[in-house]
Amino acid sequence: MTSHIATETSVNRWSTEPVVREEGRPPGPEDFPSTKQGREQDGNVIGITPNYKIGEQKPNSELNLGKTGSLPRGSGDYKMTYRQEDYKQTIIDPKVITNANMPYISTRIPDPRRNLAGDFPSEHSKSKIKLDPLEQRRFRSSESRPITTSNYLAESVDRHREMEASRLREYLKAKENEANQPWNKPGWPGPKKNDESLRELETMKQRIETLKRDANKGPVNAELDELSKRAEELRKRDGWSKYKLVESDIYKTDPDPMPANIKDQVRDLLESRNSVETTTTQRDHDKSGYVTDVSTATWNFSTVDYSPRSVVSMNGASHDILKDDKPRSIMKRNDLVRREQMLYPTVDTQVVKSVVKKPTVTETVQRFEETRRTEEVERRVQRREKKERRSRHHSSSRHHSGWEGHTGGYQGHRSSSLSRGGHGGGGQETYYRQETTRRQQHNNYDDNFNRGIAHARYGSLSDSLRRGELQYVPNGEVRQSFYRDGSNGGQRMHKSYSTRDVFTGDGYDDRRSVSSFRRGSQQQVSPFVEFPPTLPRRGGGGDYRREEDAYFRPVSKSRSYADWDDAGRAGMGREVRRYDDDMSRLEAEFRDSLLMPMPAGNMNERDHRTEQLPGGYETFNKERHANSGRRSGRDGKPVDFNEATQEYNYKREQTLNDDRRRR
């Protein structure tokens, strides 16, 4: 495993505008003035560390270098003061370049006091919320794979191959002619940590760097250096040893060593994780029996000093006085490795080989998409003669003839089962109610006439439920705001869970008309009787059983949402067949009205969300438009219009790989 530190250092310099203050009249040359000049410099260093790195309240530390020089205090006829502030900002950005298996969240210090309850999934790399699909795929490709048998075996084979190529094997290998010889091999050399020549090399490097720096140095600011030394003495007394001063340069010292418990935590964290490119080298096997070499990966978990971006601003300096001292241990380790390679030329183990195995089953993508569109348009003309029209249709013969003509065209197929049959009438192409889309605000009887089974007092079940005229509790009461005075006002009505028909009995002894579609709850005296499903529906006697219904027609769904009927089913001929179709239409419509209630008034809303799922994403789109108002129609009468459109789109795409499905 290779890892080294690279630091990017950027320096910004800027100055404020010079401020010149004059007092008195400037002297002329004939005045023979005596002039006193003075100069004063002020230095201040501020080191800023992000607060979450150190866990302290104060994230910055200031170092005041004090003033140098003095200004003359004497009085004079003319005084000129010139003031300018120079700033220099040095940004040191250390980066680790490594192929160790480091989680991306490792830039934060693990807090041992942090309880598990605050460990949210969004803080880990598996959460890819608020990412577009391309970014999600990129994350998924670099995310950790589960340890499967094939992966484990492949890694173990690679490990054995690398051991075959190692120098230790060459060293331990015995030749045939040495079989009977005594063991006289020299001791395993291995890398020596405290090599004297290596130390000399390091000091030579430092001398060369110092000479280079002296050659490139600008004019020496002796006063500032003197002040720096004084400040260093003061800091020694304060016991602040975070910086060390070499000549006129301030170096950061090494951070405190990491506590052992945190190191163990990090080691566990790292060793339980596999990356996509698992590369191992001979050095790592010497150190640990595991794939990951943790010791090189945990260097940056410093409890005090490490931050991804340390910002230091400096006032009044003539050259760079803040430099980053590279951590020695890693540099020494790299030098050791290089020197070892020079001494013992072998196969280069530093090259990262990434072998990508192609899986047998690549991926299974699940796609799910649902789109719905609902439109509702209401036009209501203001009428004068409401009461006359309302009482016009109360004779049974008019109703009956209307029904005969209205249901005649629906004999061939079940009119409203559009989702089942795939064929419908001309006005009913869509899944939703299209036959007549008026919403009845003040139920004109004339408007409600001939609309289906639920037409007696309201346009449709979902409309009346939405308006609050009728409260439906599935096996409870049907409460009506009107007809409270009737004998049936609070009667409990049963919801049928079977496909059996529910009748009122006694062959219509109360002489109600066959097609009286008014909600005559006062007339309904007889109890509810359920026919057993085994009996044929053609019973004895009674003018309400028609010949068209001589065969047994099973109903496709149990009647769930509205099992109350208008005046006890009102006959068994065409009306019953139409009743079943209207029931399925009403159920679909009631469900959709609950799912997507229509907006009222003027509205233009758009809701779009994309959420991240494990292995995929889902999008949800909803648009609602509505407008209402009043305009004059063609004949000049005022028309209240109310239009609403809703579109709903839900899409889910998910990738399932074999490992996830197997578990």
Curated annotation (Swiss-Prot):
GO terms for biological process: embryonic morphogenesis; hemidesmosome assembly. GO terms for cellular component: apical plasma membrane; basal plasma membrane; cytoplasm; cytoskeleton; hemidesmosome. Residues 1-78, 367-430, 517-546, 597-663 are annotated as: Disordered. Disruption phenotype: Embryonic lethal with failed embryonic morphogenesis. Disrupted intracellular structural integrity from the 2-fold stage of embryogenesis resulting in thickening of the epidermis, abnormal intermediate filament distribution and detachment and collapse of muscle from the cell body, particularly in the head, tail and midbody. RNAi-mediated knockdown results in developmental defects whereby 95% embryos do not undergo morphogenesis and arrest before the two-fold stage with abnormal head and tail structures and reduced motility within the eggshell. Residues 381-400 have a biased composition (Basic residues). Residues 1-15, 517-526 have a biased composition (Polar residues). Isoform a: Expressed in the uterus, the vulva, the rectum, mechanosensory neurons and in head and tail neurons. Isoform e: Expressed in spermatheca and weakly in the vulva. Isoform f: Expressed in spermatheca and weakly in the vulva. Isoform i: Expressed in spermatheca and weakly in the vulva. It comes from the Eukaryota. Residues 367-380, 620-640, 649-663 have a biased composition (Basic and acidic residues). Keywords: Cell junction, Cell membrane, Cytoplasm, Cytoskeleton, Membrane. Interacts with vab-10 (via plankin domain). This is Protein pat-12. The lineage of its organism: Eukaryota, Metazoa, Ecdysozoa, Nematoda, Chromadorea.
